[in-house]
Design a protein with these regions (language model features):
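N-terminal catalytic cores of NTP/NDP-binding nucleotidyl/phosphoryl-transfer enzymes
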Residues: 33-94, 220, 225-256
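Short, conserved secondary-structure transition motifs
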Residues: 115-123, 280-290, 429, 434
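Residue-level signal for inorganic ion chemistry
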Residues: 60, 91, 131, 135, ...
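Aromatic/His-enriched, Gly/Pro-containing loop or helix-boundary segments
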Residues: 104-126
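Non-catalytic terminal extensions that flank enzyme cores
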Residues: 4, 8-9, 16-48, 66-71, ...
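A glycine-rich helix N-cap at a beta->alpha junction
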Residues: 89-112
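Active-site cores that bind ATP or allylic diphosphates and position pyrophosphate for catalysis
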Residues: 139, 143-362, 366-367, 372, ...
Length: 452
């Protein structure tokens, strides 16, 4: 298939298709450009910085330093409902502890600011208006209740070319109706108008050529009802205006890249589009690495209590049964995943608990896994509003910043050869996107301790 990956990734609402069965192909090669490179780390201040985010920052930092480029920090704080006081300061402190001080960003200066998205609203409004004027975006007046009704009626519903004319928006309404709705102050969002019968094709530095059929893409919201941009709009505008040459981010954003390529095209910036690199997921460690005779009873009790707290509808009496089942299942930790998939003679409570255990012990590493499994998943300690939102970090566990960087660098990147211990400068010179793995990488706390 011309090296096009025809696979599904863990990302929302998009499937990769062959490029041969569609009427038109949009293609953009993003070969590495290594002169005057500019990379950004762009976290959202919604809480403590997860170790997966630190790895993303590290890969951006290493590539920038290797080629004498610029590493900048941009704070993506457009979702004010999720803003957490102190989170931005935490992010900066974590980067500085690890020796990754940005060249530009809030508090660091730079010629491309402001570096907080909440301070750049006029720019987003300007370019959103351009898309509206060109017919590449449209007003949508649907209420949250109306959208929920659509989802209840059809679980596969998505707001796309097939559905948009059945909804309340400036494409389905008469011009005078749209004018009246706007004049009356009717709440609206602005959506991207995804074209029909096209394939969006781009080159990812990790995953090679990737293709998305636009029939599988929804019309993403670009501007919310509160006048703030979504990630998609703000991200593209900022990356272009800040002259970002490489976008290194997590795999969960891979499907969104199709929308971003369209936005670059519609805004006339396609020739300046950055290179993309989507990093593999960080996965939970194998249960074999942390379950032993001493930890199994504690883990079984913890899982049963957490299940009971999250699912009170299962009844208070089930907690002891859940603990007993977990104790039995954990004894055969090597085949735990298989046991949790078995459904023979399961009652509803047991089936629900098995699903909970599967999600808790396998899959993507989450911020709750540190307390749950007994190791840090944050660089620094974080004190939240409650005990359940407070975490101990690598620094407080006694890890050195150099050891933490070395450990994180090898979570998804293979330097080749036998060397595992790297000084920071050695990491900088050795790092390349070409040796970043496609498959997810399991977190291994024993390996982290070895580096320390």
């Amino acid at each position: 298939m011309n090296n096009v990956q025809d696979v599904n990734f863990a990302a929302p609402s998009a499937t990769i298709f062959s490029i041969f069965s569609v009427a038109k192909t949009i293609s953009k090669s993003t070969a590495p450009y290594m002169e005057n490179i500019r990379l950004r780390f762009a976290p959202s201040p919604t809480g403590p910085l997860h170790i997966g985010g630190v790895r993303t920052a590290l890969y951006n930092y290493l590539l920038a330093r290797k080629h004498g480029g610029t590493f900048l920090l941009r704070v993506e704080d457009t979702d004010q409902s999720r803003f957490v006081p102190g989170a931005e300061a935490y992010i900066i402190e974590a980067l500085e502890w690890l020796g990754m001080q940005p060249d530009e960003g809030p508090g660091f200066g730079g010629d491309y600011g402001p570096y907080r998205q909440s301070e750049r609203q006029e720019l987003y409004q300007k370019y959103t208006q351009q898309l509206l004027d060109q017919g590449d975006a449209y007003y949508a007046f649907d209420t949250a209740e109306e959208l929920e009704q659509q989802r209840q009626a059809d679980v596969t519903f998505k707001y796309d070319a097939g559905a948009r004319l059945q909804m309340r928006n400036s494409l389905s309404m008469k011009p005078e109706e749209v004018e009246k709705a706007l004049a009356d102050g009717t709440p609206y969002v602005i959506r991207l108008k995804v074209p029909e019968n096209e394939t969006v094709l781009f080159t990812d530095e990790v995953r090679e050529e990737v293709a998305f059929d636009t029939s599988e893409l929804d019309d993403k919201v670009l501007m919310k009802a509160d006048g703030m941009p979504t990630y998609h709009m703000a991200n593209i505008v900022d990356d272009h205006l800040m002259e970002i040459t490489h976008v290194i981010r997590g795999e969960e954003w891979l499907s969104s890249t199709a929308h971003h390529v369209l936005l670059y095209r519609f805004l006339g910036w396609e020739d300046d589009m950055p290179s993309f690199a989507h990093l593999p997921l960080l996965l939970k460690p194998s249960p074999e690495s942390y379950l032993d005779k001493q930890s199994i009873p504690k883990m079984a009790k913890r899982m049963a209590e957490e299940f009971a707290n999250r699912h009170p509808e299962q009844g208070q009496g089930y907690e002891s049964k859940a603990e007993h089942f977990a104790l039995q299942a954990f004894q055969d930790k090597k085949n735990l995943a298989s046991h949790l998939k078995e459904k023979d003679k399961d009652d509803a409570q047991k089936a629900a608990f098995k699903v909970f255990l599967k999600d808790a012990m396998f899959g993507k590493l989450s911020k709750r896994d540190g307390d749950r499994l007994g190791f840090p998943v944050f660089p620094l300690s974080w004190k939240g509003a409650s005990a359940s939102d407070s975490f101990v970090g690598f620094r407080e566990y006694g890890f050195l910043p150099e050891a933490t960087l070395n450990f994180l660098a090898l979570l998804g990147w293979n330097p080749g050869g036998e060397q595992e211990l790297f000084e920071k400068e050695e990491l900088t010179q050795a790092f390349s996107l070409e040796r970043v793995n496609k498959a997810g990488t399991k977190f291994n706390i024993d390996k982290a301790r070895w580096f320390n």
